[in-house]
Amino acid sequence: MSHPLDNIPLLPHVLSMDYNVIIAGGGLNGLTLALALDSAGITTAVIDAFAPQESLSPKFDGRSYALSAASQKMLDALGLWEDLAHHAEPMLEIKVSDGAAGETPSPFVMQFGVEDFSQGPMGFMVEDRHLRARLAQATKASNVTLQSGQTIINQTIHSTHVTVAIDGHRPITAAVLVGADGRNSRTAKTAGLTRTGWNYNQCSLVCAISHEKPHHGIAHQYFMQSGPLAILPLTQNRSGIVWTEQQHVAQNIHSLSDADYLDILRPRFGDFLGEISLAGSRYIYPLSLSTTHRMIAPRVALVGDAAHAVHPIAGQGLNSGFKDVAALAEVLCDTRRRGQDLGIHTTLVEYQKWRGFDNAVLCTATNSFNKLFSNNNPLLRGIRDLGMGLINAAPKLRKSFVATAAGAAGDPPRLLRGEPL
């Protein structure tokens, strides 16, 4: 279907640039943005510090992602989902409750199911290794220029373009530079985009387990004194574990043998899935909050963790990054259709307005949830148990929660509605 702006001719460019857009960082957000822009005919180069043999190693990242229904629609719109679908496990139900090792589950439970979301599964669990491999495969088959194992050493902003200097290679130019280079974003720092953040003194212990009984597509989240424990359904009778502990405790647990590790996990996990065993390597990730005050600077925009790295308590980190990707791709695509310079201030301001407030809310919410739920204060525990019970008893409120988590609330970008750019 043609877009109303498709028939507006492009204005002649005074400067011949190497690309329309340069993306710093070839992770999940960076490659997804590159493929989205490529689908709209916007020439893109991705500069990634990791060599392919590093980033595509099955042990590069042990995490799994709870992709929202909207994120799944975007991947489908970009032609990525068909090959990913057999690696994805639908989330049909979510149960949230207080918990403690060796205790019976709290009677106050928030339970979200198919009756709360009429559009199908609320989300899909996908392992990092499968998503990363599919993005790499699609990038190789696209018109995107991927320069792996290369490091950006400088960026210079001009009135008409940005020049990026790459260690050991010639500089390249584009209308816009996008920072998708993570929470320690060099792009953001060089652009003068200041950050706020702190460490939580917590780490997430991450692994996959095999279990005796089927999970039936149910995701569980228990709020323990030290932090949340998430049990997330994966394919082949496996579940992904995201187990948060205080930093020193987590480091001690991570250093244990597999057998001792499981001995500590079992009382927290319970026996509802029968006997459990490790189904791969174990990982540990320190947790922190890191957010920039703005997502844009002259000819620079940030996406994903480069702009907002949050606590995993709500499982929305990658989904939030994909919202950035969809919004930025849309405003750049529409600017191109109008025949305008992709890096003009009004375009980047539109992106900031679209995503800035939502990301600020996410940072505030995840930080507040972590403070509220990562403790065993009897008063706070009583308040949160009462709150969960009230939400569970209110169908309209449950549906609102699910719509927000699924990315279906508000006015999402076209890609998140499953529509092409």
Give the residues covered by each predicted segment.
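N-terminal Rossmann-like FAD-binding beta1-loop-alpha1 element of flavoenzymes
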Residues: Y19-V46
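Conserved Rossmann-like nucleotide-cofactor binding loop
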Residues: N29, P52, N184
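Glycine-rich FAD pyrophosphate-binding loop
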Residues: D38-R63
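Conserved FAD-binding catalytic core of PHBH/FMO-like flavoproteins
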Residues: L75, H161-R170, V176-R282
